[in-house]
């Protein structure tokens, strides 16, 4: 009898449990994802190069993150997508000057509760000593599935991270643009190589699905949307991966400094959100992920994204107080006087002829290296160094990036080919005196400034030779090299020592490969000298030794015919800068 009663009770209990389970309510989990990318050292709302207040910054992002965490709590995930270690002197100071303190980029992201980071090409450019130290100091994993250790054949960094919130399992796969060998010397990434993004993503997607069985998969790619093939390598393959590798719900991208928020269909017909917050923490990617769960399983999910403007948020006083010592250290560093300059110089003149700004770079490169010819471009579209004291901050205007100085062997014919391609990207082929001298994006909207069709950091001129640029001629026929700067003959068949930065020397901008016609694999064999430190370091040393700089245009090149180019330069200067050419 007791046995029957026990069985009856058990059956009733099981029935109740089954009824309850069958009527279990669905549960919605909301997760907020905030992506920063290409912050480029813009940690404080102050430009330490131009010495003025600035937009964006992690100080504003902190205010936004705090606001979102009040709403979503631990379900608010801050993710960084790389290129955080180069740009402003704040990063440079903790990269190379104060190497004993915790790197400010690590300390700030730790403070803000970042859950995962990614490697960017400008992080790699700082070199192993810097990025290895920074990675160790981050309280979160820095990803890089396609950064491969030559010794093991395995990823040098953690390939993916698993994040769990309220029973929802999220996988984040990190990758970097594989085009780094096209820009950076091997010493900066020694012992490593970079796998193409699409095959890497395909392989890791299978591993993640099989091993982790996540509910949501996020791609964290330091690569732009699409295009730009460098040799056999695609620089920006994020869209290809989003469309061609089924499984991603969200793809967070960066690198190309271009805002984007769009949904694309993958090969299975499912939507994938692709979002890019551009650079300098002026906006962040703001993604809302809603997961509906029942019986411990995901039955529905939705993804919505937008770009949130950080300039609508106040600077976080809490953040600024916490990092006040670091702010002061950087401010003291950039305020140090290293010399004086006799006149104001600007890159604005560099597009229209020989200019004091670029010719100062040429002179320094030739003096430091002992080369016969120098190549250099305006690395900032509109940089200026004012007459008077030169401080460390001015050096970041004079030379924007941490490039090394190379000396390479080039033939006279290769020098001409290099310049032909450079000027074809920069100068229009004029058919009439009324045409533009510069190669602009057309049409130019009425009342708006003109923009170059191509990147101005690829507009190299030369020093050490006298030459003309005939803008009535097509590419391949524009450049006439008259002589060496000292008047001696220039020989198309002779090999010359050419000073240029490491970005260009490794094939950046394609001027050495497509222009000069040197095979990519041969470039490293042409390098006969490379500095140990970045070019800015040697420029600072040079100025401290000289004490007074008296820059002037060397007038070793000019646009012709003069009767066309001089009036056209005045018109185009006004279109570019909204002011008259002096």
Model-assigned labels for residue ranges:
Residues 1-27:
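Bacterial Sec-dependent N-terminal signal peptides
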